[in-house]
């Protein structure tokens, strides 16, 4: 009898968990079925290959944004951070090639990767220091620094588009292993490392604690400012790596290479279960969210829907994702008994938990 009574609440709890954490997978399955019905070419092996390869740099970038969001922040400057990394990296390679007979050795390509990650790290750290030490809102700070990076990009490039990357740089995309480009495996490695850091390390627990309640984390001995600074710095570094991967894919770069990626990653993160309030997140769900965004773009193109309509659809998805996140994280009423006097048997009252 007791087991039958407890079955109902357990079933309700399981349904609630599936609703909160499994929505992204239901949406993913629905989109695959819908676009396959609209155009059977959607589920072809060639198109699936394109979806996987075109998602790799977004997955890498998504792992970056997971740190800052789970830590309770947001970074809207990462798009132009990517542009800064890609344009300066191209100009460095071009300068080296022009002074060395047009050749760029592999060791210099490795230097470029170190440079891109380092530059992203420093730009992210700048955001983190301003937010943590001046106690400013990350949203406002990163909008401002985004404009700074944007101005620097256009100044450095003179609004030009650069193309023709060295073959050994593009090897990250052109070299295949088991039929897939190397950067797909790089994206998988980033997912594994991010999951491990956030779930199995002391730093990851600190990030979750600061994102969940910064003041409680500080009172428990966690250096909340440094955790916030490091989450921004790690986000910048990972976006720097994503910028280099994107450049290898596109075989070109400009001041517009990167902006817009922050929108895709932010939406995918929220869809995938990373709360805008911080303190919780699921990197596997984030990957599913990336595929949701890519499937929408790819499916709409195959369906012959206008490119401009995609912006409207993606905007609606972001608004819906934010609303759903707010709904999931709103305070839930609980019943507490207040006794006004000993033995008076106070009336139960509802309060927000």
Label each residue range with its predicted role:
Residues 1-31, 37, 219, 223-226, ...:
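Cytosolic-side transmembrane-helix boundaries in multi-pass membrane proteins
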Residues 24-37, 65, 117-120, 146-150, ...:
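Hydrophobic core segments of alpha-helical transmembrane domains in multi-pass membrane transport
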Residues 33-38, 42-96, 129-136, 270-280, ...:
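Single transmembrane alpha-helix segments in multi-pass membrane proteins
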Residues 40-53, 153-156, 180, 198, ...:
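Inter-helical junctions in multi-pass inner-membrane proteins, predominant
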Residues 98-145, 288:
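Alpha-helical transmembrane segments within multi-pass membrane transporters and channels
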Residues 134, 138-200, 227-230, 248-258, ...:
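Transmembrane helix-bundle core of multi-pass membrane transporters
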Residues 203-228:
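Short cytoplasmic-facing helical segments at TM-TM junctions of multi-pass membrane proteins
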Residues 239, 250-315:
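Transmembrane alpha-helical segments in multi-pass inner-membrane proteins
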């Amino acid at each position: 009898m007791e087991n039958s009574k407890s079955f109902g609440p357990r079933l309700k709890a399981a349904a609630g968990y599936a609703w909160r954490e499994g929505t992204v997978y239901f949406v993913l399955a629905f989109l695959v079925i819908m676009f396959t019905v609209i155009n059977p070419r959607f589920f072809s092996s060639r198109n699936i290959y394109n979806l996987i390869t075109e998602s790799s740099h977004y997955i890498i970038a998504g792992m970056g944004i997971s740190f800052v969001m789970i830590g309770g922040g947001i970074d809207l400057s990462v798009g132009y951070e990517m542009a800064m990394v890609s344009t300066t990296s191209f100009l460095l390679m071009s300068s080296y090639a022009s002074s060395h007979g047009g050749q760029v050795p592999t060791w210099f390509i490795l230097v470029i990767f170190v440079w891109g990650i380092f530059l992203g790290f420093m730009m992210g750290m700048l955001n983190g220091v301003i937010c943590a030490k001046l106690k400013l809102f990350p949203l406002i700070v990163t909008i401002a620094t985004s404009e700074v990076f944007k101005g620097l990009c256009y100044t450095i490039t003179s609004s030009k588009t650069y193309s023709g990357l060295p073959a050994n740089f593009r090897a990250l995309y052109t070299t295949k292993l088991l039929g897939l480009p190397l950067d797909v495996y790089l994206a998988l490695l980033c997912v594994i490392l991010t999951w491990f850091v956030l779930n199995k390390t002391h730093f990851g627990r600190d990030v979750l604690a600061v994102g969940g309640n910064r003041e409680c984390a500080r009172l428990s001995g966690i250096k909340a400012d440094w955790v916030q600074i490091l989450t921004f710095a790690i986000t910048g570094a990972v976006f720097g790596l994503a910028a280099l991967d994107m450049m290898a894919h596109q075989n070109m770069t400009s001041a517009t290479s990167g902006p817009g990626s922050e929108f895709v990653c932010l939406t995918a993160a929220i869809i995938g279960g990373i709360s805008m309030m911080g303190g919780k997140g699921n990197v596997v769900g984030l990957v599913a969210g990336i595929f949701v965004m890519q499937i929408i773009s790819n499916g709409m193109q195959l369906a012959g829907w206008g490119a401009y309509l995609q912006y409207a659809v993606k905007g609606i998805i972001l608004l819906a994702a934010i609303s759903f996140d707010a709904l999931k994280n709103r305070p839930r009423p609980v019943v507490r008994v207040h006794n006004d006097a000993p033995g008076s048997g106070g009336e139960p009252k509802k309060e927000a938990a």
